[in-house]
Design a protein with these regions (language model features):
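A structural signal for well-ordered alpha-helical segments within the folded catalytic domains
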Residues: 29-32, 36, 89, 93, ...
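A structural signal for short coil/turn segments at secondary-structure junctions
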Residues: 42, 98-99, 127, 227
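Short loop segments at secondary-structure junctions
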Residues: 54, 98-100, 180-184
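Short, charged, surface-exposed secondary-structure boundary motifs
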Residues: 77-85, 139-145, 265-269
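Conserved donor-nucleotide/metal-binding helix-loop-beta segment in metal-dependent transferases, i.e.
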Residues: 114-153
């Protein structure tokens, strides 16, 4: 990796966006669309791609070479479990592969709508050692149904992972995470990874699986509780299952628009809009928009329909 050493006296010294793509070619396509849109607004902002193989990624999407600054390769054992693709494992093991001191991690199923530099700088200024999209919080006295967390019943989490009555867990959407290389963020990741690998919740006890497998978010949620840690909240991505916002409202209020979940989760009203934006931007740059979102969502690691 061609990374300049971090100057610890300058908290802004090492910062960048981190994307992850491996397995299916469509994830490299999504990574390209997102990276292109980020560079559209800020050409000097560093973007790292954590992938299974730089050679494989650029073979299936040569355009990545125009938008990615740093490649970091994951070992196969951190991508697969019993020869099956395991994205959740890669996400809980992400910490050791982060190339910057201040890392804005983004799931690749999104398009950037404005310059991300102010967001990153604000998170650094606020000393947000770990920040993410928080959707709810829960203590066991509130009952077993943690409505904002779809993965498991609360009482089963408390029992399986040895949480105590005073523990509070936070439900997150891990599509966005700001991660400083520091003791607190490392502790969150280490515990989440240990539970995921060595003490996972049995799949048959999950209320909902992620693409047929383990959801990384569940293990982060529990790790917050066991570490007595409240994540810093960042509301920078628009997630939509219904037509709640106009296009102009999204552009005014958010940095990015996600097309999360499987085919049909995000209305085509929005995904078609994102494709139109990508096409128009690329036409201005004299290139062709090839990686249409519907070609990506058909192959995502997610539940097949809403």
């Amino acid at each position: 990796m061609d990374i300049q050493p971090t100057n610890q006296s300058d908290k802004h010294a090492s910062k960048g966006v981190v994307l992850v793509a491996f397995g299916k070619p469509q994830y490299y396509w999504a990574a390209y669309n997102l990276a292109y849109s980020i560079k559209r607004f800020n050409k000097v902002l560093q973007i790292a791609l954590i992938c299974d193989s730089q050679e494989r990624a650029t073979y299936y999407c040569h355009d990545l070479t125009n938008v990615i600054d740093v490649y970091v390769e994951l070992p196969e054992q951190h991508i697969y479990t019993n020869k099956k693709l395991d994205p959740g494992k890669a996400k809980v093991l992400l910490y050791d592969y982060l190339p910057y001191h201040n890392n804005l991690y983004l799931d690749v199923d999104a398009v950037c709508l404005k310059d991300l530099q102010p967001l990153i700088d604000q998170l650094i200024e606020n000393n947000a050692e770990y920040a993410t999209h928080v959707v709810g919080e829960h203590t066991i006295d509130k009952g077993r149904d943690f409505k904002q967390m779809q993965w498991a019943w609360a009482d089963q989490l408390w029992q399986h992972f040895g949480l105590v009555k005073s523990d509070k867990i936070y439900a997150i959407n891990s599509s966005i995470q700001f991660i400083q290389k520091c003791e607190k963020a490392e502790a969150i990741y280490r515990m989440a990874a240990d539970m995921y690998i060595n003490n996972p919740m049995p799949l048959n006890k999950l209320r909902m699986k992620w693409g047929g497998g383990q959801p990384d978010e569940l293990y982060f949620n529990v790790s917050f509780g066991k570490n007595k840690f409240k994540p810093y909240e960042v509301n920078a991505i628009c997630f939509q299952m219904n037509r709640e916002f106009t296009f102009s409202q999204i552009e005014e209020q958010f940095y990015l628009m996600s097309y999360y979940g499987g085919k049909g989760f995000t209305p085509t009203f929005y995904t078609d809009w994102l494709d139109r934006k990508l096409k128009a931007w690329m036409q201005e740059d004299g290139i062709q928009h090839k990686y249409f979102i519907h070609r990506i969502t058909d192959h995502k690691h997610a539940d097949p329909k809403r």
